[in-house]
Structures are given as structure tokens and as C-alpha cells.
Regions:
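N-terminal "first-domain core" detector
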Residues: 24, 32-65
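Short, well-structured alpha-helical interface segments that form or flank functional binding sites
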Residues: 44, 48, 52, 73, ...
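Charged, compositionally biased N-terminal leader segments and the immediate start
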Residues: 3-33
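Long, amphipathic alpha-helical coupling/dimerization segments that relay conformational signals between
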Residues: 3-10, 24, 83-192
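Structured interaction and signal-relay segments at domain junctions
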Residues: 53-86
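Exposed alpha-helical structural elements
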Residues: 17-20, 30-37, 62, 73, ...
Length: 192
């Protein structure tokens, strides 16, 4: 709904796809407030998560070539990004940052598989940070609420980065979004 979108100061007037995504995703001001409240307690735990993430990436023959030459700077960038998931702000700048991330990935020739794998790792590991000991300090939030807020935000990040890949592919092929959608959803089988 527009109330959710406006409460986060994301202007979707010229972005129908983002408006539609956010209307289904449901990330709202209460989610943002939860993540921001947890941030000071979560922030010290994020460096270990970054290390675990890059250990996994470096162990992968498919992913290692994309990071091996700049692991230290990428770890710093990743850590700043994970902190932003909790600190915000969740506004037009947040949208622009994620579009920029997609553009950088394109320039670096980082495949969409990397983003999807990264987000899958975070969806599995980040909710583990919401321990009972941490949540005791925040009686207004339970594990399910905190996890839902975080997962909604990670999904939004992936949507914003992924669509940069699709937009680039459309530009490369010289096709419109409507044709791209038709090509993606058309069946290769002819009706019998």
C-alpha cells in the first residue's frame, strides 16, 4: 500500500515495478524501526558473518575468481552494506545505492548467480543473530517479527540489484520491457 511506501520515503511515482514489488513485500516503518533498534547490538556480530561469507565464496571455484584480487576491500564494502541493512535510511538513497551495486556488478562482470548465492547465504545466516539473549532486551519484538523484517529488506535489495541485470540485458538486446517479458514467459512448446 502507498502508506508503507511513503512511510519509508521511497518515491515510486515514476517506478511502477518498484511500487508493485513493495506493495507485495510489505516492508514498512515498523520493520525499519525494529532493524534500527537492533543495529547497535547486531553491528558487532557482522564482521564474523562477513568472514564466514567470504570463506564460503573463496572456497567456491565458481565464485573465487570474482573476488580473489580484492578480498579485503570487498569485505569492508560488504560489512558497510550489512550495517546499512540495520541502520538505514530506507529511502530513495537506499534504492539508488542498490541500483549502483547492480551497475558495479555488471561492470565487474559479476554474474547474477553471485548475488543470488550471497542473498541465500544471508537469508540463512542473518536470522541466527536474533538470539534469545538479544531479544530479551527488546520485548516489543519477537524472533518471527525481526526475521520477517530482515528478510523483506533482503528481498528488496535483491530485487533492486537483479533488475539492473535485466535492464542491462534489455538495453544490450535493444528490446522493450514488454517484449522482454513476453520472451521470458512464452512457452517453447506449441499447443497440440
Amino acid at each position: 500500500s502507498k502508506a508503507h511506501i511513503m512511510s519509508l520515503n521511497i518515491n515510486t511515482a515514476n517506478d511502477a515495478d518498484l511500487a508493485e514489488f513493495l506493495s507485495h513485500n510489505g516492508f514498512c516503518e515498523a520493520d525499519a524501526n525494529c532493524l534500527q533498534a537492533l543495529h547497535p547490538h547486531i553491528s558487532p556480530l557482522l564482521p564474523a558473518l562477513t568472514e564466514a561469507f567470504y570463506e564460503r565464496i573463496l572456497a567456491s571455484d565458481a565464485m573465487r575468481p570474482f573476488v580473489i584480487d580484492r578480498v579485503d576491500s570487498l569485505k569492508q564494502t560488504h560489512l558497510r552494506w550489512m550495517n546499512m541493512l540495520f541502520s538505514g535510511p530506507f529511502d530513495d538513497q537506499f534504492v539508488q545505492i542498490h541500483q549502483h551495486i547492480g551497475e558495479v556488478h555488471l561492470k565487474q562482470k559479476i554474474p547474477p548467480l553471485f548475488v543470488a548465492s550471497s542473498m541465500a547465504f544471508l537469508r540463512a545466516e542473518m536470522p541466527k543473530l536474533f538470539t534469545p539473549e538479544l531479544l530479551e532486551k527488546f520485548p516489543q519484538y519477537d524472533y518471527a517479527f525481526c526475521t520477517s523484517a530482515l528478510l523483506r529488506l533482503i528481498d528488496t535489495c535483491q530485487f533492486l540489484v537483479d533488475r539492473t541485470y535485466y535492464q542491462s540485458l534489455m538495453e544490450l538486446l535493444g528490446i522493450s520491457p514488454k517484449l522482454f517479458l513476453r520472451l521470458m514467459t512464452s512457452s517453447s512448446k506449441q499447443p497440440a
